[in-house]
């Protein structure tokens, strides 16, 4: 009897301590990889990676363009990648995937959510009906001699990766959603991309990689979770856009969607940085490599590193 009471009491204490630890964990995003920043101890390079911490969850979003640089920045920022709830790879481009090699040396079993691509980096096979067949050809001119396997297996540079393909909006943890999209732009036509949306009491926290499906489309998808967007953080892919489009996007995000804050990075583009700064003023959050963006609440970011 006393033993059972003691076990129940111990279980209650463990739950209380776990809840307290989660409550004390800061809600924040640490920028691990980008091509602009303030810290001399970090290496700038084209690409994107961020550690998202919210509600006790630790989520790696993208892994940068160079595994060695990713490793350097992670170590300089004293970030522990062995203790992750999961990782998200926004899309297949190398400036978001190259650090997977380093991640898997530290955390080989980590779940990695990826776009549901029919072929390519994440070893997804494709049925043999994707190509037309011509039985009139001799066998030596036909693929697989005219007898292809039912599934053509894709290759991957990370054969041990625990990749989980996502093809529809998925709630991967309470209040944490992965939003898939598809690019319709000529240069990246049909490219699949994932964004991360977290429902907070102050609105949606929206993390994006490159916004190839279009930042307006991604924001619109996020408003299905909550019409109020607390913050939009990441690459908005305006680097090649003319001034009129740059200004239009800034106005749409501020006036139409009424985002509370923006923290642009990566492929957003310098002219778009300037346009968003003009539109959002004090609600523009600097998010260069090494920055720590508080979630949700504070509209300022600090630079992480030794002594911080």
PLM regions: where:
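Metallo-beta-lactamase
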Residues: 118-194, 285-302
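Conserved beta-strand hairpin/beta-sheet module of binuclear metal-dependent hydrolase folds
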Residues: 28-77, 189-207
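Cap/insert and terminal regions of metallo-dependent hydrolase folds
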Residues: 111, 195, 201-293
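Active-site environment of divalent metal-dependent phosphoester hydrolases
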Residues: 38-39, 67-69, 93-98, 119-122, ...
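Active-site metal-binding motif and surrounding structural segment of the metallo-beta-lactamase
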Residues: 68-113, 117, 223-233, 237
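Bacterial N-terminal signal peptides
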Residues: 9-18
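Bacterial N-terminal signal peptides that target proteins for export
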Residues: 1-10
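Divalent metal-coordination and catalytic microenvironments
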Residues: 52, 62, 74, 91, ...
